C-alpha cells in the first residue's frame, strides 16, 4: 500500500478498512478481531461503530486497542512539525531505532507519518461510542500518552468485558516487546469466547 495515495480523512480511511474487513469476513470461517495501535485504536472503534450500524456482517469477537487513552483526549499536532522535529518526537517516544533511522527509510516514512498524523489530529468522535463488544486494552505503564485516568475511560466504550493488559517499555511497546505482544494477542481467545 506504500504506493497508494494518502487518506484525506478518517472517514475515507475507515471506509477502506470496512471494505477490506467485509471481504475477509465473508470468506472467514472463524470469528475475527479488530484492532489498532494509537491512531489505529481510534480507527478500530470508528470501524466497529460502522459495522454495528450497517449490520452487513458480524461484529468482531473483540476490539484490541493498544497505545491509546481517551478517545477524545487532546492530540499532539505532529503533522505541522518539521522533519527533524518529527524524528526527535519519534526517537523520544521510542518509535525509531536501528535501521529505521537510515536516510532512505526516513524519506519514505516521514510523509506517511505526517499524513496519518493529520488524519488522526483532525478527527474526533462527536460522541465516543459504547459498543456491544469485548475489548482488550494494551498499554505501557511508561507511556505518557496513556495516563491511567484516560485508560479507565475504555470501560465506558463497551457494554461487555474490558480487559487491561500492561506492558513495560514505552508508547511503542508493540515494537520493543514484539514477541510478548504477539503472544498476548494470540491468547485472547482464552478471555473472549464470543
What are these regions (language model features)?
Residues 33, 37, 62-64:
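Residue in the alpha/beta-hydrolase core beta-strand immediately N-terminal to the catalytic nucleophile
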Residues 36-40, 44:
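Gly/Ala-rich beta-loop-alpha elbow adjacent to hydrolase catalytic centers
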Residues 144-150:
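Conserved alpha/beta-hydrolase "acid-adjacent" motif
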Residues 110-128:
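Active-site nucleophile elbow and catalytic-triad environment of alpha/beta-hydrolase enzymes
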Residues 1-32, 69-85, 167-171, 191:
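Active-site catalytic motif of lipid deacylating hydrolases and related acyltransferases
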Residues 163-194:
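Catalytic active-site module of serine/aspartate enzymes centered on a nucleophile-bearing elbow/loop
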Residues 49-88:
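Flexible "cap/lid" loop of the alpha/beta hydrolase fold
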Residues 137-139, 143:
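Short beta-strand/loop motif that positions the catalytic acidic residue
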